[in-house]
Amino acid sequence: MVNEDAKKVWAYIDEHEQEYIDLLKKYCAQPSVSAQNWGMREMAEMIRQTITELGGNGTLIETGGNPFVYGMIDNGAERTLTLYNHYDVVPPEPYEQWNTPPFEPTIIDGRLYARGSSDNKGSLLSRYIAVDAYQKVLGKLPINIKFVAEGEEEIGSPHLM
């Protein structure tokens, strides 16, 4: 059984579905191909901005490779949840195997097609959307949230350590 607060959050997400889809399209339209160093800093900056809009202190951390994005919503809670994601994608080649251009998000039969839509920009945004919806509906989270997003997972995370 779903509690009433959860129903309110889900209703908010449903009401703002197009806004969230548009944000996912924006993320997927931004290339972030780590193997080709294509669009990495721009994507990191987009994520930093989203964290800031959620009320966190988003910042880029230089690594010698692609930047890490770090942020925190500090609610003074005893517990902290860390959300790890990566923002890089694999190269889109070969292009001829795509039915639509990989960095032009397209909805077909209710599904969004674009490079990174499921690995990993959709996953990253689903967590951020949950934080956004909770805060808009219920106010302050009962926990602190740390956001960590790296830009080299698809090439073995050489600067993670």
Segments predicted by a language model, with ranges:
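Acidic/histidine-rich catalytic neighborhood of metal-dependent amide-processing enzymes
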Residues: 120-161
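Acidic/His- and Gly-rich active-site-bordering loop/insert found
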Residues: 2-115, 136-143
